[in-house]
Amino acid sequence: GGSCGQCRVDVHSGGGEILPTELDHITKGEAREGCRLSCQVAIKQDMEIELEESVFGVKKWDCEVISNDNKATFIKELKLKIPNGESVPFRAGGYIQIEAPAHHVKYKEFDIPEEYRGDWERFGFFDIESKVDEETIRAYSMANYPEEEGIIMLNVRIATPPPNNLSLPAGKMSSYIWSLKEGDKATISGPFGEFFAKETENEMVFVGGGAGMAPMRSHIFDQLRRLKSKRKMSFWYGARSLREMFYTEDFDELAAENDNFEWHVALSDPQPEDNWEGYTGFIHQVLLENYLKDHPAPEDCEY
């Protein structure tokens, strides 16, 4: 707890002193006004708190797994069906929370296509088991955008222990999500979030890598497909190799349809079979050297 900084609440009385874990996300001025992270506040007395109005729009849904497919070696796309007649009124860039019950997951039972199994076998990941004796809740950004109705789509990277110490515990939630199969049930709540696009005409620069694809896809599709935005925008995405790329056809299609949008990929570890002639290195450095460094006004862009 205390790592994402999203669960802000104003505590007007009670709650005790603010904790060091909270000060990574809350300024001293905000703390003086009573701002806290709700996940870090122990309820030991009567309290007076103030919540954002949007919190009261949060609901819970029991969903059904439509699919749970590998999009990269360590990333799955979990697609959930919202109950008939229901909808999750989220904004692009928002997130939901998903619940995992107590579980015992064996990685050898994961459904992983042959093209991705090599690294799993080389690192010994199929020997991992996740044993969790309590309910776990984690937050994930939506990869779909609001007009893709009736579903919730997540990009989930498996949190394995390091290959040199497989005795360490695996990620509780990612292990559970990777074990889900078509027809299984999953409980989510939401929507939440503050990572929303500003309604301006400023240039937009999207930067992401790995499972950070999710909010990028949601934002970009929302801007171009729903809002029909004519703002200049570019997407800079980093992956290890071509095998780790996904949604390529989606973004190629968007670029072909919209003169105001372009996207770029940088590979940090291209493989010989990739025959890669594009950008190499880490995406933030590639973005700086190949675009922002010579941009006339990078400070006016929205990132």
Swiss-Prot record:
Its cofactor is [2Fe-2S] cluster; FAD. Its EC number is 7.2.1.1. Composed of six subunits; NqrA, NqrB, NqrC, NqrD, NqrE and NqrF. [2Fe-2S] cluster binds at C4, C7, C39. It catalyses: a ubiquinone + n Na(+)(in) + NADH + H(+) = a ubiquinol + n Na(+)(out) + NAD(+). It is found in: Cell inner membrane. GO terms for biological process: sodium ion transport. Pfam families: FAD_binding_6, NAD_binding_1. This is Na(+)-translocating NADH-quinone reductase subunit F. Binds 1 [2Fe-2S] cluster. Residues 58-198 form the FAD-binding FR-type domain. Gene3D superfamilies: 3.10.20.30, Nucleotide-binding domain of ferredoxin-NADP reductase (FNR) module (3.40.50.80), Translation factors (2.40.30.10). NQR complex catalyzes the reduction of ubiquinone-1 to ubiquinol by two successive reactions, coupled with the transport of Na(+) ions from the cytoplasm to the periplasm. The first step is catalyzed by NqrF, which accepts electrons from NADH and reduces ubiquinone-1 to ubisemiquinone by a one-electron transfer pathway. GO terms for cellular component: plasma membrane. It comes from the Bacteria.
